[in-house]
Amino acid sequence: MSEWLFDLGNSRFKYAPLDGTRAGDVQAWAHGAEAMDTAALSALPSGKVAHVASVAAAGLTERVLASLRTRFEQVRVVRTAAACAGVRIAYADPSRFGVDRFLALLGARGDAPVLVAGVGTALTIDVLGADGQHHGGRIAASPTTMREALHARAVQLPPTGGAYAELANDTDDALTSGCDGAAVALIERSLQHAARTLGMPVCLLVHGGGAPPLLPLLPTAEFRAALVLDGLATWATHSAAP
């Protein structure tokens, strides 16, 4: 493959070949906040063009870019644009709109209005009209981050473990139920508001490494594991080379 897509998130690194207008088979691994294993970097593919999106720390981003520049003839880094591929961002200053949210909207663009919920380090929610107009969104802590924050302030509360229950009868289950339930409630409230605002039903797309535990609680949701990479593929095919 001559063109590849790279998505460097806060805690996971994903990449895939550009396959037409979509992402091909995805490879992914976790990374530290400030570093990535040297062996992992040395195993990256090579080709003609690398299309890169990053919300990771500046130092880690530059290290990955430096590695890619030794493997590709051209490395293109995505920046959020006011408009791309029929999507128009609601932010007055598009540079303040995260590139991961931007690409998720590009990947979600279709013939129906959609609410896009990304569950990673943060929980991000964005509403996109059928005409491609972004109607804004929300940012909150994801369930994983909620658990970590509670553990940091009250060490006796475990950072992981437990199963969801509507009314839990032990601490581990209560923590999972509260944190997962808070995320689901915010998504559901946003979905209801979007439907009222747009005057029609709104589809729900969910993506991100923290999404699978929420899916049983969101029966109408469609899970799109490669949504950001699909959006990056859209950006790659719609934006002119610098």
UniProtKB/Swiss-Prot annotation:
Protein's name in the database: Type III pantothenate kinase
Entry cofactors: NH4(+); K(+)
Major place of residence: cytoplasm
Superkingdom to which the source organism belongs: Bacteria
Summary of the function given for this chain in its UniProt record: Catalyzes the phosphorylation of pantothenate (Pan), the first step in CoA biosynthesis.
Root EC class: transferase
UniProt keyword Transferase present: yes
Cofactor binding, per record: A monovalent cation. Ammonium or potassium.
UniProt subunit comment: Homodimer.
Keywords: ATP-binding, Coenzyme A biosynthesis, Cytoplasm, Kinase, Nucleotide-binding, Potassium, Transferase
Catalytic activity: (R)-pantothenate + ATP = (R)-4'-phosphopantothenate + ADP + H(+)
Residue numbers binding ATP: 7-14, 121
Lineage start: Bacteria, Pseudomonadati, Pseudomonadota, Gammaproteobacteria, Lysobacterales
Associated pathway: Cofactor biosynthesis; coenzyme A biosynthesis; CoA from (R)-pantothenate: step 1/5
Name of encoding gene: coaX
SUPFAM superfamilies, A to Z: Actin-like ATPase domain
Key word Zinc present: no
GO-annotated biological processes: coenzyme A biosynthetic process
This enzyme's EC code(s): 2.7.1.33
InterPro entries in UniProt: ATPase_NBD, Type_III_PanK
Pfam families the record matches: Pan_kinase (PF03309)
Annotated compartments: Cytoplasm
